[in-house]
């Protein structure tokens, strides 16, 4: 038997957590995610967005959303761009680990849509120009995973 999640978002409730740091990028990711959710049938009233200060704060609010019982999936969006110090490595590692563990802890799909790029240009490319919009891709993944995970509920 083959199991697949379909891409119809009607009747799904989705939480989105967005890091405000690098907002000129994260706002584009959010726009892409909202577009993806709505294009696939998720009603605007069924989408909640929580802004947090930066990427490092994303896992806590994503966990609270996932544990609330109100959402079929949670999308995390942020942008971490390498600077001159090792701070980038610590933030990227902790955010990735934090978000990755949430689906296993909560049984709710928590989608990792946090950009970790070497340059501003790479981030811009992934927020709606050359490399598509990772926010949109995260929305599609959330819909698919919400349906797929319900097959074993």
Swiss-Prot record:
By its UniProt entry, which InterPro entries does this protein fall under? LS, LS/RS, LS/RS_sf
Q: Which GO terms describe its biological process?
A: riboflavin biosynthetic process
Q: Where, by residue number, does 5-amino-6-(D-ribitylamino)uracil bind?
A: 21, 55-57, 79-81, 112
Q: Which pathway does it operate in?
A: Cofactor biosynthesis; riboflavin biosynthesis; riboflavin from 2-hydroxy-3-oxobutyl phosphate and 5-amino-6-(D-ribitylamino)uracil: step 1/2
Q: How does it assemble?
A: Forms an icosahedral capsid composed of 60 subunits, arranged as a dodecamer of pentamers.
Classification via Pfam families: DMRL_synthase (PF00885)
Q: Which family does it belong to?
A: Belongs to the DMRL synthase family.
> MF terms per GO, please?
6,7-dimethyl-8-ribityllumazine synthase activity
Q: Which domain of life is it from?
A: Bacteria
Species of the source:
Bacillus cereus (strain AH187)
Positions of the catalytic residues: 87
Entry binding sites for (2S)-2-hydroxy-3-oxobutyl phosphate: 84-85, 126
Give the UniProt keywords, A-Z.
Answer: Riboflavin biosynthesis, Transferase
Q: What does this protein do?
A: Catalyzes the formation of 6,7-dimethyl-8-ribityllumazine by condensation of 5-amino-6-(D-ribitylamino)uracil with 3,4-dihydroxy-2-butanone 4-phosphate. This is the penultimate step in the biosynthesis of riboflavin.
Enzyme Commission designation: 2.5.1.78
Q: What is this protein called?
A: 6,7-dimethyl-8-ribityllumazine synthase
User: GO cellular component annotations, sorted alphabetically?
Assistant: cytosol; riboflavin synthase complex
So what does this thing catalyse? (2S)-2-hydroxy-3-oxobutyl phosphate + 5-amino-6-(D-ribitylamino)uracil = 6,7-dimethyl-8-(1-D-ribityl)lumazine + phosphate + 2 H2O + H(+)
């Amino acid at each position: 038997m083959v199991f697949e999640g379909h891409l119809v978002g009607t009747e799904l409730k989705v939480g989105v957590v967005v890091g405000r740091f690098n907002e000129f990028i994260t706002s584009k990711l959010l726009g892409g995610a909202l577009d993806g959710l709505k294009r696939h049938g998720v009603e605007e009233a069924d989408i909640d967005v929580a802004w947090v200060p930066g990427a490092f704060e994303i896992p806590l609010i994503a966990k609270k959303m996932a544990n609330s019982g109100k959402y079929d999936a949670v999308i995390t969006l942020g942008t971490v761009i390498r600077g001159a110090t090792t701070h980038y490595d610590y933030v990227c590692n902790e955010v990735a680990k934090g978000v990755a563990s949430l689906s296993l802890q909560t049984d709710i799909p928590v989608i990792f849509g946090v950009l970790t790029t070497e340059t501003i240009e790479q981030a811009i490319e992934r927020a709606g120009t050359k490399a598509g919009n990772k926010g949109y891709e995260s929305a599609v993944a959330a819909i698919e995973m919400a349906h797929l995970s319900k097959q074993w509920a």
